[in-house]
């Protein structure tokens, strides 16, 4: 009985910690429970329709009128990685790529509790530890020690969860314009992205590196760059004629060397 109680108490914070969206590998048939989400964004994908004898009926939205099977209904592949969801229209070449906002799992109910009792959890962690040691030294009661040990583990896991959620809040979600404090990082790697440049009347000046000479607005500056900042990796996607993904380490951005090297070469010449 004591073992079952310990297991139950330990499982609660563990479940909270792992309450995240599952990954979804690239597939043409997403899970049925997710069809409503995908068919809201990609209502022209074939997995949203049941087509028989040239007549197609929507699988999710029954009030949708039947339509004739035609080029509107396309073959699609979908996948999900943490904070972003993507679907490809595979019947078009080159493939068209679309990004959508993944449905967010709500952590608000336990985040509010954790934030409210943050100091209490910290003090409680030390208090239970002290009582645990004192009780073991004085009475050496195994049952009491086990209960206190369970409480100590719960306080520890809750504190880790609190720290984890704080780090989650600092992540930069998918977007076309990264935070200003991160511009130096992104413009080191994706120096041709439009958010790195201030363009007026066909003349573009770099927002981050003031020593960079003005350049004329041209195809070098991609006007569609998307950035994703996960816990330990950063991605940016440049969309110009066809999508192109780049990955880098967030914690160790490459120093801005390309312009310095160029200026040194010019000085030598």
From Swiss-Prot:
<keyword id="KW-0244">Early protein</keyword>
<comment type="function">
    <text>Plays a role in virus cell tropism, and may be required for efficient virus replication in macrophages.</text>
</comment>
<keyword id="KW-0325">Glycoprotein</keyword>
<comment type="similarity">
    <text>Belongs to the asfivirus MGF 110 family.</text>
</comment>
<dbReference type="Pfam" id="PF01639">
    <property type="entry name" value="v110"/>
</dbReference>
<keyword id="KW-1133">Transmembrane helix</keyword>
<keyword id="KW-0812">Transmembrane</keyword>
<dbReference type="GO" id="GO:0033644">
    <property type="term" value="C:host cell membrane"/>
</dbReference>
<keyword id="KW-0677">Repeat</keyword>
<feature type="topological domain" description="Extracellular">
    <location>
        <begin position="166"/>
        <end position="269"/>
    </location>
</feature>
<dbReference type="GO" id="GO:0016020">
    <property type="term" value="C:membrane"/>
</dbReference>
<feature type="signal peptide">
    <location>
        <begin position="1"/>
        <end position="26"/>
    </location>
</feature>
<feature type="repeat" description="B">
    <location>
        <begin position="147"/>
        <end position="269"/>
    </location>
</feature>
<feature type="glycosylation site" description="N-linked (GlcNAc...) asparagine; by host">
    <location>
        <position position="75"/>
    </location>
</feature>
<feature type="topological domain" description="Cytoplasmic">
    <location>
        <begin position="138"/>
        <end position="144"/>
    </location>
</feature>
<protein>
    <recommendedName>
        <fullName>Protein MGF 110-1L</fullName>
    </recommendedName>
</protein>
<feature type="transmembrane region" description="Helical">
    <location>
        <begin position="145"/>
        <end position="165"/>
    </location>
</feature>
<keyword id="KW-0472">Membrane</keyword>
<feature type="transmembrane region" description="Helical">
    <location>
        <begin position="117"/>
        <end position="137"/>
    </location>
</feature>
<feature type="repeat" description="A">
    <location>
        <begin position="1"/>
        <end position="145"/>
    </location>
</feature>
<feature type="topological domain" description="Extracellular">
    <location>
        <begin position="27"/>
        <end position="116"/>
    </location>
</feature>
<keyword id="KW-0732">Signal</keyword>
<dbReference type="InterPro" id="IPR004848">
    <property type="entry name" value="ASFV_fam_110"/>
</dbReference>
<keyword id="KW-1043">Host membrane</keyword>
